[in-house]
Amino acid sequence: ARAEGKEYKTYVVLSHLGIDTTTPVEWRGSTLAEALSNYAPLKGKRVLVLDGHSHTLHTATYGDNVTYNQTGSYLNNVGRVVYNSDRVLSHGVISHDEAKKNYQVNPTVKAMIDDIQAKYKADSSKVVIENSPVKLSGDRMDVRVRETNLGNVVADALLDYGQSAFTHKSNLAVTNGGGLRETIAKDKPITKGDIIAVLPFGNSVAQIQVTGQNIHDMFVKSLGSILQVDESGKTVLDENGQPLLEPSGGFLQVSGARVYYDTTLPAEKRILSIDILDPETGVYKPLNTNGTYYLVTNDFLAAGGDGFTMLGGPREEGPSMDTVFADYLTRADLSKYAVINPNSRTISISSADFAALNKKENAADPTLNPLAPVTPSTIAKD
């Protein structure tokens, strides 16, 4: 095996795939490790796969040359792999308690960390708005499973920004539920620290041009999880009697679109209809699979991350998502987001109930129009 024209004996793969059962087998870190062990150019080479995502404490060997290691989460363990140029001598983890017991604190490093923490605390305590009138849920069993008010307000912030920031007005906005990491409390100030806790990854806003077919395929992927079951094996239902999906970081929170779906159907057939907001008229119109649309999202999804291979290509980029979100919060009427699971944009419904609906939903509805509540963005467009 060669890289940059040079021969190497050892390869270290840093991945974030995981091994949990909700991840398709072909996307798992263990599948990658096994594939590398069977890859002829790597025979006789040493390969270390250092993985994450599923928060699993797991170590394994594949074939005679691939070692897989994952150390759990939240610094509970530190991975340790000892090897020489010929073979791995040992691999495993050092627990947090073991590290505290057997390793001494480096005072120079501690002083550096203390200084950084003090500066961060001072900056993150700055108040963005004095009071949040609603709880915005970032619970993983909300944002990774179905439409939530936090997902709506973040997606609305993206769509609002996309009305004037790019060459073309954005038609719709999406962000992955796995990128929303914390709840914003009711009846308390919202600080910069709260916003960073919700959006901790430093993603920037990005817009890409997509086809209607890309949008359809994107939502098929978003809504493709297996169904939740309880400890007795019984399917877990939502308030309307529809099966809930298993949590997925790729579940999309949406603005500027309404997606009706039936979770009782096979994953590839769940979507019943998709309507897209016309930013010029405020009217929702049926998706044209041959049409061209402008999608505003985060740079991770815009590049096709989280398995959204139908996305990607050239993009325009803006500032950080947390900056755009903070600006939107200062102008939005948050009382409109009081319902945690509104079921108004990604709408879980039975096929029978959908067939019986009066199709008035295609008319403009200001209660669902994410562009109505706020004035145009004043945030810097560069």
Q: Where would I find each of the regions flagged by the language model?
A:
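Functional cores that coordinate and move charged inorganic groups
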Residues: 1-118
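Catalytic centers of hydrolytic enzymes
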Residues: 72-382
